[in-house]
Amino acid sequence: MKLPCTIRSITSSHFRNSFRNVSSVIDSAQEECRIAEDKQFVDAVKRIVRGKRSWEIALSSELVSRRLKTVHVEEILIGTIDDPKLGLRFFNFLGLHRGFDHSTASFCILIHALVKANLFWPASSLLQTLLLRALKPSDVFNVLFSCYEKCKLSSSSSFDLLIQHYVRSRRVLDGVLVFKMMITKVSLLPEVRTLSALLHGLVKFRHFGLAMELFNDMVSVGIRPDVYIYTGVIRSLCELKDLSRAKEMIAHMEATGCDVNIVPYNVLIDGLCKKQKVWEAVGIKKDLAGKDLKPDVVTYCTLVYGLCKVQEFEIGLEMMDEMLCLRFSPSEAAVSSLVEGLRKRGKIEEALNLVKRVVDFGVSPNLFVYNALIDSLCKGRKFHEAELLFDRMGKIGLRPNDVTYSILIDMFCRRGKLDTALSFLGEMVDTGLKLSVYPYNSLINGHCKFGDISAAEGFMAEMINKKLEPTVVTYTSLMGGYCSKGKINKALRLYHEMTGKGIAPSIYTFTTLLSGLFRAGLIRDAVKLFNEMAEWNVKPNRVTYNVMIEGYCEEGDMSKAFEFLKEMTEKGIVPDTYSYRPLIHGLCLTGQASEAKVFVDGLHKGNCELNEICYTGLLHGFCREGKLEEALSVCQEMVQRGVDLDLVCYGVLIDGSLKHKDRKLFFGLLKEMHDRGLKPDDVIYTSMIDAKSKTGDFKEAFGIWDLMINEGCVPNEVTYTAVINGLCKAGFVNEAEVLCSKMQPVSSVPNQVTYGCFLDILTKGEVDMQKAVELHNAILKGLLANTATYNMLIRGFCRQGRIEEASELITRMIGDGVSPDCITYTTMINELCRRNDVKKAIELWNSMTEKGIRPDRVAYNTLIHGCCVAGEMGKATELRNEMLRQGLIPNNKTSRTTTSNDTSSKS
């Protein structure tokens, strides 16, 4: 019989429930049995741990080793909470001998136990090992707190240790997270010292906003900050540029009765100095006495550095003096900034004195400051002091670098001590310093400046061999050397080589070449180069314009010179005395002294201050024109305008009075000089002797000579040459030779001008070419031959009609490195025209112009006259027109001849 479906269902359900109940009872019984067995197992292991049996044997049994789990170890460690050393031994034994993988909880239980027993070092080591597992800070905290509760602890020291470890491990943000979990989840508070370390860790990693947030959290849970925490907070506020709150924090710290020290005040002083509120910082330092605090070395150094930042170097020096009086040893940064500031202010002596004083404290400025100080001393021409400072560097153990040596090498080169400069270069190499282009540039410039171009070329070659690329400075220095020797073509070749390498010329390059081109008389090339500056985006400066002005003045083209003065001022470049001086001299040299006076007066009305050199040119102009009264009037105006007459001015006036035989003025000037306490120098005495020698008044000339010696002035080669020249021209050649022989014993060596006096006599009048050639050969041996001496010899050959020998002499002079000039060629052209050999004369003319030598007025007149005599009227007219285009005025003879030719052609 079948049961109804419902009954079957009820019966089935009842069976299942009954089964579940039975199963649950069985499971519960089994769990209780397992727990009991685990407890028995743990107790057994505890007995082993605390017993005297060998752990190696007891714990190696299969019964123990197979059953031992992490939960068992945790229970055993909790059981050793009062004997953490035993627990640590057990922990380490399992790890080292059984390779047991301990749980995080086991680590945390043992850390708690060790900290409780004040065993912080092993606790810290254990914590470090745990954190190597790359666990999340929250996971570590949760397990650590769970174990804290299981162990029924009351101290939060383990959590402090965790935060401190995160700070030491540069995981400051993880430390902050632990702190926040402590105060929000479990109401535990770290120690103040832990929070101080955490806050300073945030400051160290520039988490200033988080540092402030941490501080606020601390205060909100009732933690009372100490001075170290306040210091970190004040530093954070200063870094956040919130100086108002920083000052409020100082006040709050003082109000809470916190045991303060100087450190937070130093931090605030530093913050104020960085914001350039130095005087407020100085005020805080002054107020320290009222707080029973004394400024320390940090206070002073911070203030010195801050004062230097706002350019208050004098006050900074006073602060440094105060610090040194207290026997505080200043920092290198404070000393360096103050020394550098004083140096920039031009107070080199104060800077040097400070360096000497701080050496006693074992402090010295850094190498950069020493280099800058040595450089300033060199620029101030205090070379001895620069060398002493360099020596002092070695004594204090400060090793010079390549910059130091470069500065000193440059100094010695500028002074002409080229051998010393070379020895320093060798010292650089010996000390293993890397050579740069700078010392080579100095050596090249120095050797060019003192005339040794071949050595300069050698240094440039050495540079290139050392794979050092010449710079624009290198090229410009060598160009300047070539220009000074009259080798303008070499200078121009070097310029094209430089630009061909893609090195852009500087303003100094252009100015150097322009000066050289003007000296060589290559005006058109100078103008072309001046215009080329724009192509290189180089703007002319005052010096460039001064070169252009002076160049045109020396050529006598005053209108062009004034055009450049106008252009200069229109471009906003203010002229200086170097601009005006050549204009004044140029006007005077072209017979326009009165116009020069008008120009000078105009400058005075325009508040342009002229120096005595400018006025000397004007005095020279009036004296040259015989206008001595006007010259004396200028002297009065000079005094009224605050310009003192110097020896040069008096020399010009004395020379003028002698040339125009104004004895009254001459003696009046000597008396005036005496009344002013001025003694004639060798230049004035030589001028007086020269004037008397030229008039043949040798008795008076030698009388002045004796007076010169009695007054302590030694005659030089110019003085000797003046008398020798006068004697030669007066026909007293033997006496001149005797005087010349007396020069060397008194350290006056005859120069090319001296020998030129004899050469001039031998090649004029009764020409004695044999003696002239012998003398010139002697001049050549003494390396004294120049263009003038060659010209005299050429003139002598031409006068004797020995044109071939004269022509050979031109070839020889070029071979000797002496450049022919316009006079050289004009002398030859004149002789060729005299012989009616106009064809060769024109060929020589073309050769001259192709070499870049500009013909002068005499040259044009000579060749034009020769062409007219030879019937070459077309060429004569062509030359006259060219002459006029050059701004040169033909003489009367040339004008008459060519004008009559023009009239004949028209008719």
Swiss-Prot record:
- Which PROSITE patterns did the record assign? PPR (PS51375)
User: What residue spans carry the Low complexity bias annotation?
Assistant: 891-907
Per-repeat ranges for PPR: 103-137, 155-185, 191-225, 226-260, 261-295, 296-330, 331-365, 366-400, 401-435, 436-470, 471-505, 506-540, 541-575, 576-610, 611-645, 646-680, 681-715, 716-750, 751-782, 786-820, 821-855, 856-890
Key word Repeat present in the record?
yes
Name of one Pfam family that matches: PPR
Tell me the domain of life.
Eukaryota
Alphabetical list of InterPro entries matching this protein: Pentatricopeptide_rpt (IPR002885), TPR-like_helical_dom_sf (IPR011990)
Alphabetic keyword roster = Repeat
- Region labeled Disordered — which residues? 887-907
Similarity comment: Belongs to the PPR family. P subfamily.
What is the name of the protein in this document? Putative pentatricopeptide repeat-containing protein At5g59900
Give the organism's phylogenetic lineage: Eukaryota, Viridiplantae, Streptophyta, Embryophyta, Tracheophyta
